[in-house]
Amino acid sequence: MKPKIVCLCGSSRFADIMAVIAWLLERDEGAITMGLHLLPQWYPGVPKHHLAEAEGVAEQMDELHLRKIDLADEIFVIDWTDYIGESTAKEIQYAKDNGVPIRYLTHESKYIGFICDAEQGAKE
């Protein structure tokens, strides 16, 4: 059976959670995941937030992300702390307009539990 393709959508402030969810979806559901990719802080000239804006390519990256949604069987919204930013809201609307099913992290108790447990373990 062909694996489903999942496009991860969410704020770059949740890139760490996005990476964990990508791993869990691939491990537990056999899905292929696509999402945003951030450069590490040690990469020359990387600002703390919004690299695409700093490099003047935000519009290009936003458009590319919509193409990822076009390829996806569903989107998975990383709405940690119930936060959905402007870009993510546009991606959700785009998915709705194009009939792409939408899942939300906050509605996925097994993944929420995993993230909460992992965060708690990291603090101990």
Question: Where in the sequence are the language-model features?
Answer:
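Conserved catalytic or regulatory cores that recognize and/or transform ribose-phosphate-containing ligands
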Residues: 1-124
